[in-house]
Amino acid sequence: KQKGISPFDAITLASIIEKEVPNLEDRKKVAQVFFSRLEQGIPLGADATYLYASAVFGGEPFPTNDSIYNTRINGGLPPGPISNFSSTALEAVAYPADTAYLFYVTGDDKVNYFTTTEAEHEAAVAKYCTITCAPGYIAED
């Protein structure tokens, strides 16, 4: 029970991390971001969750998809895993990075940019994510 979560919640979180980021060190940072957000009552904001909801339950693949799996609009974890996960994703949940990050964005260059404040996050989005963060962009799973 890392960070006081159940094994089922750890698996759910690992499944989100699996779909969000491929790099082990970034997975650990994203796990830390997610734990911090859960502790502070901030939605996870994981794009992989609304993409999953759209693929499985229908609806547009946008951040406004009205699904209980969409962590852009709902707090906490979704009701269950959104994919299979690797040992590295589960390792990230068990051993998250020790940082103060609260935000991250995957840039158009597929690099993850981590920040601590919303202002820094918005600046990173504006600088590194002009295509894939644009309104109307349809992400592919």
Where are these regions (language model features)?
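Bacterial extracytoplasmic/cell-wall-associated proteins, especially those involved in peptidoglycan
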Residues: K1-D141
